[in-house]
Swiss-Prot record:
Composition-biased stretches (Basic and acidic residues): 1128-1147
SMART domains referenced in this protein's UniProt entry, alphabetically: IQ, MYSc
UniProt name for this protein: Myosin-2
Gene Ontology BP, a term: muscle contraction
One Pfam family per UniProt: Myosin_head
Known function: Myosins are actin-based motor molecules with ATPase activity essential for muscle contraction.
Protein family (similarity comment): Belongs to the TRAFAC class myosin-kinesin ATPase superfamily. Myosin family.
Modified residues (Pros-methylhistidine): 757
Modified residues (Phosphoserine): 392, 625, 1092, 1096, 1162, 1237, 1243, 1261, 1288, 1292, 1303, 1306, 1474, 1495, 1514, 1542, 1554, 1574, 1600, 1603, 1714, 1726, 1739
Residue ranges of every copy of the IQ domain listed in the record: 785-814
Keyword Glycosyltransferase: no
Length: 1939
């Protein structure tokens, strides 16, 4: 807490900003018990203070300050903060943070008129509802440049922090001033703009335009003047606020690079134009209408043809017409001057007033209905003439366009008659359109004027949006305003609670995410998302027949009951009807949708718009020049073909677009939040309603903001910046001369400082601090700097003093020496020898002098030569300096160009960021739409499910509704009776109120007369007493202030001297830095020279490497040519050898012939000789050629060896050069690192010195201005003191005379005791009126301080007089009599005193004028000093620019160095490549030798392949042997069958004999058998039908499965691998299928055999003459057996069908694998043919077996065998089904993986929008890895399948071996018996499954039937519900109509 002296700079605002030192000490010493002092919850006051009396069983008894005793729960008691935290400035510092603590802190500060309070990271302000002196100019200067913790909370502090952040962080800032309507947002916005206009003035007067003779102010004046103009046209009185902004504005104040004002612009949002034509009772229209009618400028009344009575104009008089807190006359003057300052021309100004007046006249236009027609006609033309005159229109055309507008019908235009209502609505729409367009045009003109075209870098945006509104009648405007506030609150919540915590997570700080539950997304989505309120409204606007009712119904259908934030309001008595309610963050608002469609479409009369476009009033024509009328559109379509709907944009769509732009702007800035609070609803100063304030605190997230500030780390700074700024705290912690990471340096530095280590955390890039710790570090840094500076000053002063002392000592010694010599000379002066010495001495020295002259001439000549040389050098240096200056200028131009390019790049970057944000928003909208669609689908399905449940409930509801209807009718009658009684009581009360008001008026009139008499006398007395007390007080104040000013002046002079010394030191340090910079430049030049040398070396080495590469290539080409020559020589040599062999062969043949011939002729001998000679010649040639070839080969080998040796030497040289370059590279790196570190230290030192210079310059300028002001004040005060002392004597004499009069008057005031209270109230009102007058007087004369003090003294004297009035009750009669006598005598004296006072007042005015003149001169000096400061700032900026240029040079050098590094690496790579090529050439030399070895390897591989082929042949032979084995087995089976055949034939013969014997008997029972047969056939037919039905069902299932399998086969190429697995199984399946077919045929034949057996058994029974009963039993047994056989046949059929299905499934795979199968089975064709032959033999034998009747047992056994085979088939089928199920599962898994991959791909695409190509590459690599894993898995599966096949083959071989073994026959028979038992159990299971399927079928049909019945019942119930709804609506409408 600062002392009272520190607060003195705030002037009279100090007590309103911070509590005094005395109050703080009292609070600390106040007794306080922390255990018993608490806040307790209380129903009326929300929370009250109290003390705990007792605690029992979770209950606490508390005694409140009012004396009441409350017993509450533990959680309703909150501990109180200690007294030192009373009125604390930052609530985040409180010990106990809870709602009552925050509430009472705000309340106590508000009671002391401290309206600003910090709440963590933002500021809370409470509306005082009165004027406070906290915005004076001295307050602005006091806050300038102050840190947040150095000054009390204020809107100026927030503004200055934003300004400083903008300068330091180089980031755009925004100040968001939010709160409910009437909370003070507009006032705070004005103060922010005032602050920026004051502290960041440009200092340049704006040039006046030659065209307009109007006065225009500076840019800061124009920015300030924009507010009064916009408030006049955009602000109005509402229920909650006298000056409510009815539009939103975002004011951007742009600053240049130096922080000076550059320009400004204003964006406005959603002007409430409906207020132009309609206001509620307690409201009024825009201020401008009432300013014009205030008659402050009578010329406006005449020009606009209006009266001064607002009630003459219905558009502006529907509510109130005056506001107590607004002076419309003064505001008109302010508005008019603002128009002039903002540079509007006189013509534009007149047009603004004219259009405003025309809007007023529009409200008086009257129309009537024509007789016998519905059309409207004008009811008089006077008003229309005025409106048309003001708009420069023809009144007849205007009325015609209103009553008979032209409408397009087809391709023609016709005039259409309008009704009175339509014309009235059209007039209102035109008035609103004219006003709105004029307002928007004014905003664009203001922006044009504020755009000064100066360079601008950053901006601070101030947002002032209409506050949250809850009125009795809330329309579309309120929805838009509340929606804007909802979005801003969501932005605040996201910024404060979400982004802050995400920053912690991103930086790696340990942090648990806190959900504060402040998400407003539900309400925002309800309004703005697809199918939200705005979406439905815009959709309805597109339909021509849409109405408010259809809009309401759509809202109810879409959101009622589905969204928690959307409700249907309950009808309230006495209030306007509401159609729906929305739950906003600030409360529930009831909205009325009447007229929303028209408001949203905003239709205009095109004919009138066309008249406006042709108006002679340029402004009006310009306003509507962009509007597209119907006729213009038609013309446009003929010419250019403009689309119809392109210009149609609804109000809500435009509003959302502007709001989205605003949110985008805010997201791109660093926001500062100011939360405005309404203390009470009655606008009473000083009063605070607890519940209202608590509601706003909860909604605004104040407590949550404090919590995140306390728990989190709101301050953060980069490691490098922290190290640079706070290194001074402990320089020894960071070692000098060695590199250390910024993070480690920061950790060491913080560890070495004595602070709490839990108050900060280290992130990845920043260090984070708790609230307040950074301020503590700043204080420690300031103390350390002050300590260092004082030490430096002390050492400097000591050094200077020692130097001065040494000079003094030397001077003293020299004086002593001179004195001694003079004394000695005086003693010997008259001595004769001395005289002789004086005469001879010069003669002796003449010779020496000549020598000295000669030496001096030589030295002179030398110096002359040196001077000439130095002159030549100087000229050279001057020339160099000129060139360097040119280079410097060029570099500066380059820097400027690059800065401009950088600015353009930043703009492009901003645009890209905006487009990115827009695209993200679009993506988000699309995703949200998709989510909405999914939710709608889910809701529809839920509805469908609920319908069945609701059907049963609806019947109950119908009964309940009937009962409730009866109850409602009864209640209706009761309420009607109550209403009648209440109306009668109201009438009686109205009569009594009227009587009371009459009596009250009479009493007030009587009372007023007495008060007037008393007031006149009191005024006279008060003037005299005030004058005395004023003068005495002035004398005392002047004496005290004079002494203070003298002290201040001395302090200022000392500070000035100190600052001048500091400035000199800073300048010297700057010079040192410049010297260091020059040295660095020289070093850089040296490095550049070295780099150029290195570059030349590298280029030489590159050229050498290229030459070597060329040589290598030439040698390679030469080697290839030589190899080709060698090959050619080898070929020619081979040819020669061949020719030689041929010739030798011919020679031998010829010799043989010669020998055979025995003799030869001489000719033949000669021929032989010739041939031999040729042969010898050819042999010699051949030998010479071989020798030549060997010589050339040797020469080539030698050359090649030489070239290899040369290449080796060159490679060694290159390696040596490489080593040298690497050494130089490392040295260069070290030097570069040294330079970089030097540059960093220089730049840091430069930055620190620049900051010090800026602060010192600011302090110097402030001290100069303060010194001049103090000097001026001292002079003025001394003059006033003398003058006032002379006047005080006269006043004292007059006061003595008047005191006697006062004593007489005081004795006569005792009779007014009964009227004291009334007098006090009237006196307070008078005091308020005098306050207002005093404020106006102070503002006009710029003399606020003195007159305010005088006024306060007057108030004190009045209070004393009031106390005197209360005592003087008994002397009223005497007072009246004395007053009548004395008043006549004292009138003359009073008139004389009045004259004297007038003279003194005139003198005082003259004195004020003189003071004003002095102020003007001081202003000029101030301006001159400011110019000097700006020049200094320009110099600093130049140095900054030079430093930036050097930095840029350094960066360029770094880039060049990096390029050379890259080039070096490339050359290194090329050198390595050349080495590799040399090595490859060396290897190629040995290729010829290795070719033979490779051929040997190939031979070995061929041998291995041959072995493999032999192995395969052996495998095939083994397979053939296996086929032979199979043939052998089949032959054995054939033998067995032939034996069985012989046995069967023998039995057959026996059977035929018995058959012939029994044929006669068969005829008798034939009839009975036929009957049995018919029954059996019938049953079989029924079973066949059922089987067919099942078969069809199974066929359908099979077809569906087949389609699925086909799709799976088509979709996957992986099935090819599975086909390999199925190849072996397919062959077996074919065998099994054929076997099953044969078994089925055998079963059929067995069935027939059983019939024969039945006949035989019956014959045997007749022969044995058994009874009829035995025959029947046998028949029954036969029937059962037949049934069993039939069941077996059905099972066989089922298995056959299953095998057929599996065969169909396998056929598709067979087709694909047929080619490979044919290749593989070509060797097995012979075996298959033999197998077929055997199968045909078996079938023949089986055909013969059909005739056998007696071998039933063998047939049954075969049937059992067939059954076992079928079981095996079933098992194999089951296996196949398992494999298919496995395939299905694999398919599903693969589909799932495909979906996952697709999902990942979608995510990757989304991430690609954010992450870019790197993320895509990562995902692609991941996909490739997954694909590789899938392929490896598939390979493993294929290998497993191959192994499985091998194992299956091995198993088959083993089974064949076991079948050959005869010993296992018995075991196999036992196995067959067991299998038969299993088959029977399988039969039973199949029967049970069939029965279960039948029962399931029946259940399914039953359920389907029930479902259909339920749907029918639901349809019936739904129709009944609709009927009931219609009935209930009818009843509801009846009830409403009856009410």
């Amino acid at each position: 807490m600062s002392s009272d002296q520190e607060m003195a700079i705030f002037g009279e605002a100090a007590p309103y900003l911070r509590k005094s030192e005395k109050e703080r000490i009292e609070a600390q010493n106040r007794p306080f018990d922390a255990k018993t002092s608490v806040f307790v919850a209380e129903p009326k006051e929300s929370f009250v203070k109290g003390t705990i009396q007792s605690r029992e069983g979770g209950k606490v008894t508390v005694k409140t300050e009012a004396g009441a005793t409350l017993t509450v729960k533990e959680d309703q008691v909150f501990p109180m903060n200690p007294p030192k935290f009373d009125k604390i400035e930052d609530m985040a510092m409180m010990t106990h943070l809870h709602e009552p603590g925050v509430l009472y802190n705000l309340k106590e500060r508000y009671a002391a008129w401290m309206i600003y309070t910090y709440s963590g990271l933002f500021c809370v302000t409470v509306n005082p509802y009165k004027w406070l002196p906290v915005y004076n100019p001295e307050v602005v200067t006091a806050y300038r440049g102050k840190k947040r913790q150095e000054a009390p909370p204020h809107i100026f502090s927030i503004s200055d922090n934003a300004y400083q952040f903008m300068l330091t962080d180089r980031e755009n800032q925004s100040i968001l001033i939010t709160g409910e309507s009437g909370a003070g947002k507009t006032v705070n916005t004005k103060r922010v703009i005032q602050y920026f206009a004051t502290i960041a003035v440009t200092g340049e007067k704006k040039k006046e335009e030659p065209t307009s003779g109007k006065m225009q102010g500076t840019l800061e004046d124009q920015i300030i003047s924009a507010n009064p103009l916009l408030e006049a046209f955009g602000n109005a009185k509402t229920v909650r606020n006298d000056n409510s902004s009815r539009f939103g504005k975002f004011i951007r104040i742009h600053f240049g690079t130096t922080g000076k004002l550059a320009s400004a612009d204003i964006e406005t949002y959603l002007l409430e134009k409906s207020r132009v034509t309609f206001q509620l009772k307690a409201e009024r229209s825009y201020h401008i209408f009432y300013q014009i009618t205030s008659n402050r400028k009578p010329e406006l009344i005449e020009m606009l043809l209006i009266t001064t009575n607002p009630y003459d104009y219905p558009f502006i008089s529907q509510g109130e017409i005056s506001v107590a807190s607004i002076d419309d006359q003064e505001e008109l003057i302010a508005t008019d001057s603002a128009i002039d300052i903002l540079g509007f021309t006189n013509e534009e100004k007149v047009s603004i007033y004219k259009l405003t007046g025309a809007v007023m006249h529009y409200g008086n236009l009257k129309f009537k209905q024509k007789q016998r027609e519905e059309q409207a006609e004008p009811d008089g033309t006077e008003v229309a003439d005025k409106a048309a005159y003001l708009q420069s229109l023809n009144s007849a055309d205007l009325l015609k366009a209103l009553c008979y507008p032209r409408v397009k019908v087809g391709n023609e235009y016709v005039t259409k008659g309008q009704t009175v209502e339509q014309v009235t609505n059209a007039v209102g729409a035109l008035a609103k359109a004219v006003y709105e367009k004029m307002f928007l045009w004014m905003v664009t003109r203001i922006n044009q004027q504020l755009d000064t075209k100066q360079p601008r870098q950053y901006f601070i945006g101030v947002l002032d949006i209409a506050g949250f509104e809850i009125f009795d009648f809330n329309s579309l405007e309120q929805l838009c305003i509340n929606f804007t506030n909802e979005k801003l609150q969501q932005f605040f919540n996201h910024h404060m609670f979400v982004l802050e915590q995400e920053e912690y997570k991103r930086e790696g700080i340990e942090w648990t995410f806190i959900d504060f539950g402040m998400d407003l997304a539900a309400c925002i989505e309800l309004i703005e998302k697809p199918m939200g309120i705005f979406s439905i409204l815009e959709e309805e606007c597109m339909f021509p027949k849409a109405t408010d009712t259809s809009f309401k119904n759509k809202l109810y259908e879409q959101h009622l009951g589905k969204s928690a934030n959307f409700q249907k309001p309950k009808p309230a008595k006495g209030k306007v009807e509401a159609h729906f309610s929305l739950i906003h963050y600030a409360g529930t608002v009831d909205y009325n949708i009447t007229g929303w469609l028209d408001k949203n479409k905003d239709p205009l009369n095109d004919t009138v718009v066309g008249l406006y476009q042709k108006s002679a009033l340029k402004t009006l024509a310009f306003l509507f020049s962009g509007a597209q009328t119907g006729e213009a559109e038609a013309g446009g379509t003929k010419k250019g073909g403009k689309k119809k709907g392109s210009s149609f944009q609804t109000v809500s769509a435009l509003f959302r677009e502007n709001l989205n732009k605003l949110m985008t702007n805010l997201r791109s800035t660093h926001p500062h939040f100011v939360r405005c609070i309404i203390p009470n609803e009655t606008k009473t100063p000083g009063a605070m309603e607890h519940e209202l304030v608590l509601h706003q605190l909860r909604c605004n997230g104040v407590l949550e903001g404090i919590r995140i500030c306390r728990k989190g780390f709101p301050s953060r700074i980069l490691y490098a910046d922290f190290k640079q700024r706070y290194k001074v705290l402990n320089a020894s912690a960071i070692p000098e001369g060695q590199y250390i990471d910024s993070k480690k340096a920061s950790e060491k530095l913080l560890a070495s400082i004595d602070i709490d280590h839990t108050q900060y955390k280290f992130g990845h890039t920043k260090v984070f601090f708790k609230a307040g710790l950074l301020g503590l570090l700043e204080e420690m840094r300031d103390d350390k700097l002050a300590q260092l500076i004082t030490r430096t000053q002390a050492r400097c002063r000591g050094f200077l003093a020692r130097v001065e002392y040494q000079k003094m000592v030397e001077r003293r010694e020299s004086i002593f020496c001179i004195q001694y010599n003079i004394r000695a000379f005086m003693n010997v002066k008259h001595w004769p020898w001395m005289k002789l010495f004086f005469k001879i001495k010069p003669l002796l020295k003449s010779a020496e002098s000549e020598k000295e002259m000669a030496t001096m001439k030589e030295e002179f000549q030398k110096t002359k030569d040196e001077l000439a040389k130095s002159e030549a050098k100087r000229k050279e240096l001057e020339e160099k300096m000129v060139t360097l200056l040119k280079e410097k200028n060029d570099l500066q131009l380059q820097v400027q160009a690059e800065a401009e390019g950088l600015a353009d790049a930043e703009e492009r970057c901003d645009q890209l960021i905006k487009t990115k944000i827009q695209l993200e928003a679009k993506i988000k909208e699309v995703t949200e739409r998709a989510e909405d669609e999914e939710e709608i689908n889910a809701e529809l399905t839920a509805k469908k499910r609920k319908l069945e449940d609701e059907c049963s409930e609806l019947k109950k509801d119908i009964d309940d509704l009937e009962l409730t209807l009866a109850k409602v009718e009864k209640e209706k009658h009761a309420t009607e009776n109550k209403v009648k009684n209440l109306t009668e009581e109201m009438a009686g009360l109205d009569e009594t109120i009227a009587k009371l008001t009459k009596e009250k008026k009479a009493l007030q009139e009587a009372h007023q007369q007495t008060l007037d008499d008393l007031q006149a006398e009191e005024d006279k007395v008060n003037t005299l007493t005030k004058a005395k007390t004023k003068l005495e007080q002035q004398v005392d104040d002047l004496e005290g202030s004079l002494e203070q000013e003298k002290k201040l002046r001395m302090d200022l002079e000392r500070a000035k001297r100190k600052l001048e010394g500091d400035l000199k030191l800073a300048q010297e340090s700057i010079m040192d830095i410049e010297n260091e910079k020059q040295q660095l430049d020289e070093k850089l030049k040296k490095k550049e020279f070295e780099i150029s040398n290195l570059q030349s070396k590298i280029e030489d080495e590159q050229a050498l490497a290229i030459q070597l590469q060329k040589k290598i290539k030439e040698l390679q080409a030469r080697i290839e040519e030589l190899e080709e020559e060698i090959e050619a020589e080898r070929a020619s040599r081979a040819k020669a050898e061949k020719q030689r062999s041929d010739l030798s062969r011919e020679l031998e043949e010829i010799s043989e012939r010669l020998e055979e011939a025995g003799g030869a002729t001489s000719a033949q001998i000669e021929m032989n000789k010739k041939r031999e000679a040729e042969f010898q010649k050819m042999r010699r040639d051949l030998e010479e050629a071989t020798l030549q070839h060997e010589a050339t080969a040797a020469a080539l080998r030698k050359k090649h060896a030489d070239s290899v040796a040369e290449l080796g030497e060159q490679i060694d040289n290159l390696q040596r050069v490489k080593q040298k370059l690497e050494k130089e590279k490392s040295e260069m790196k070290m030097e570069i690192d040294d330079l970089a570190s030097n540059m960093e230290t220089v730049s840091k030192a430069k930055g620190n010195l620049e900051k010090m210079c800026r602060t010192l310059e600011d302090q110097l300028s402030e001290l100069k201005s303060k010194e001049e002001e103090q000097q001026r004040l001292i002079n003025d005060l001394t003059a006033q003191r003398g003058r006032l002392q002379t006047e005080s004597g006269e006043f004292s004499r007059q006061l003595d005379e008047k005191e006697a009069l006062v004593s007489q008057l005081s004795r006569g005031k005792q009779a007014y005791t009964q009227q004291i209270e009334e007098l006090k109230r009237q006196l307070e009102e008078e005091i308020k009126a005098k306050n207002a007058l005093a404020h106006a007087l102070q503002s006009s004369r710029h003399d606020c301080d003195l007159l305010r003090e005088q006024y306060e003294e007057e108030q004190e004297s009045k209070a004393e007089l009031q106390r005197a009035l209360s005592k003087a009750n008994t002397e009223v009669a005497q007072w009246r009599t004395k007053y009548e006598t004395d008043a006549i005598q004292r009138t003359e004296e009073l008139e004389e005193a009045k004259k004297k006072l007038a003279q003194r007042l005139q003198a005082a005015e003259e004195h004020v004028e003189a003071v004003n003149a002095k102020c003007a001169s001081l202003e000029k000096t101030k301006q001159r000093l400011q110019n000097e400061v700006e020049d200094l700032m320009l110099d600093v900026e130049r140095t900054n620019a030079a430093c930036a240029a050097l930095d840029k040079k350094q960066r360029n050098f770094d880039k060049i160095l990096a390029e050379w590094k890259q080039k070096y690496e490339e050359t290194h790579a090329e050198l390595e490549a050349s080495q590799k090529e040399a090595r490859s050439l060396g290897t190629e030399l040995f290729k010829m030798k290795n070719a033979y070895e490779e051929s040997l390897d190939q031979l070995e591989t061929l041998k291995r392949e041959n072995k493999n082929l032999q192995q395969e042949i052996s495998d095939l032979t083994e397979q053939i042997a296996e086929g032979g084995k199979r043939i052998h087995e089949l032959e054995k089976i054939k033998k067995q069958v032939e034996q069985e055949k012989s046995e069967i034939q023998a039995a057959l013969e026996e059977a035929e004999a018995s058959l012939e014997h029994e044929e006669g008997k068969i005829l008798r029972i034939q009839l009975e058998l036929n009957q049995v047969k018919s029954e059996v056939d019938r049953k079989i037919a029924e079973k066949d039908e059922e089987i067919d039905q099942l078969k069809r069902n199974h066929v359908r299932v099979v077809e569906s499965m087949q389609s699925m399998l086909d799709a799976e086969i088509r979709s996957r190429n992986d099935a090819i691998r599975l086909k390999k697995k199925m190849e072996g199984d397919l062959n077996e399946m074919e065998i099994q299928l054929n076997h099953a077919n044969r078994m089925a045929a055998e079963a059929l034949r067995n069935y027939r055999n059983t019939q024969g057996i039945l006949k035989d058994t019956q014959i045997h029974l007749d022969d044995a003459l058994r009874g009829q009963e035995d025959l029947k039993e046998q028949l029954a047994m036969v029937e059962r057996r037949a049934n069993l056989l039939q069941a077996e046949i059905e099972e066989l059929r089922a298995t056959l069908e299953q095998t057929e299905r599996s065969r169909k499934v396998a056929e598709q795979e067979l087709l694909d694998a047929s080619e490979r199968v044919q290749l593989l089975h070509t060797q097995n064709t012979s075996l298959i043919n033999t197998k077929k032959k055997l199968e045909t033999d078996i079938s023949q034998m089986q055909g013969e077996m059909e005739d056998i009747l007696q071998e039933a047992r063998n047939a049954e056994e075969k049937a059992k065998k067939a059954i076992t085979d079928a079981a095996m088939m079933a098992e194999e089928l089951k296996k196949e089904q398992d494999t298919s199920a496995h395939l299905e599962r694999m398919k599903k898994n693969m589909e799932q993986t495909v979906k996952d991959l697709q999902h990942r791909l979608d995510e990757a695409e989304q991430l690609a929008l954010k992450g870019g190509k790197k993320q895509i590459q990562k995902l692609e690599a991941r996909v490739r890895e997954l694909e590789g894993e899938v392929e490896s898995e598939q390979k493993r599966n294929a290998e497993a399948v191959k192994g499985l096949r091998k194992h299956e083959r091995r198993v088959k071989e083993l089974t064949y071996q076991t079948e050959e073994d005869r010993k296992n026959i018995l075991r196999l028979q036992d196995l067959v018996d067991k299998l038969q038992a299993k088959v029977k159990s399988y039969k039973r299971q199949a029967e049970e499954a069939e029965e279960q399927s039948n029962t399931n079928l029946s259940k399914f049909r039953k359920l389907q039937h029930e479902l259909e019945e339920a749907e029918e019942r639901a349809d019936i119930a739904e129709s009944q519900v609709n009927k009931l709804r219609v009935k209930s609506r009818e009843v509801h409408t009846k009830v409403i109509s009856e009410e």
